[in-house]
Every structure is written in structure tokens, then in C-alpha cells.
């Protein structure tokens, strides 16, 4: 991921932002979820590395559609709530989270088996 960010920053001089997007479980993705989904924890360091690479390149990076509880704390400042608030879903476990008002939550299409369990930030 950071190689893509580095390449983008070096080759494309007109880039004004890099966006990392969470995977929504609709259409083809839902049908193939078990073969394409990757646990967030398994690539959290890669996200941090991409953020650091973007910063060195001077390109703003924004993380969309990731619950804060599944991002490393150092990446929270790059995460933003979805522009489509009707898509946001907060399981009941999120009610006790101190960061809920800043969090993108989960895609409403992910209710049930298509998201990782919430880890409320207390």
C-alpha cells in the first residue's frame, strides 16, 4: 500500500488527496466476501505506513468508512465520517464508545456477518 502511495506522490503531480476506502459488502463483494475480506488487524501497520508515506510526499490522505476501533490510534486523525450518513450503522456495542460521534461506524449493508465485532473505545 505504501508503495502505491509513494508512486502516486512521485509520478502524479496533480494529485490533491489519496483516499483509503473501507470495503462495502454489496454486490460482487458480498457474494465473494469469504475470499476477499481481510481482517483489519492484519493490515493496520500497512495503513500507518501509507499514512506516513503520504505525509512525506506532502499529499493529504483520508481514510473513509473504517470504524475507529479497527484502526491504529495514530491513524484516527486521518479517518473521517462517511459523506453518506444514511449508510452508517452502529451496533449496540458502540453506544458505550467515547469516540462514536467521531467514528464512521460500519456500513449499514454490513449488518450481521459482514463486519468485525465492535471494540468500544472507553
What feature does the model see in each segment?
Residues 1-78, 89:
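Radical SAM enzyme [4Fe-4S]-AdoMet core and its adjacent flexible, acidic
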Residues 72-122:
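Flexible mid-to-C-terminal extensions adjoining Fe-S/redox cofactors in radical SAM and related proteins
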